Amino acid sequence: MDNIYSTLFGIFMGEGNRGEVVGHDEVNDYTIDTCYTIDQGWETAVWYKEYPMIIVARYPNKEMATQGHNEWVETCTTNRPTHAFSVQTDHIESFMEE
């Protein structure tokens, strides 16, 4: 983006808040998405079926984001978690309605 106005316009219009993707996988009805976001940097979001997503991790660089993404794919493949700590809310959140 060229300047602050285009950055703010992009955020307002919902553009530019999802940049480079290092992983997008669907396993056991979970979706695991790791990408660069304009507001928080590298982060992994996980959601189950159509329930709201949980931001489960943030990373300082692409390499750690890739590693973290792969770990979440493995977790959702083998453990099928029902809850996760949200780095966005600082609480343990449920992947499903209780």
Model regions: which residues?
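Acidic, Ser/Thr/Gly/Pro-rich low-complexity segments that form flexible
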Residues: 78-84
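Intrinsically disordered, low-complexity charged/polar segments
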Residues: 85-98
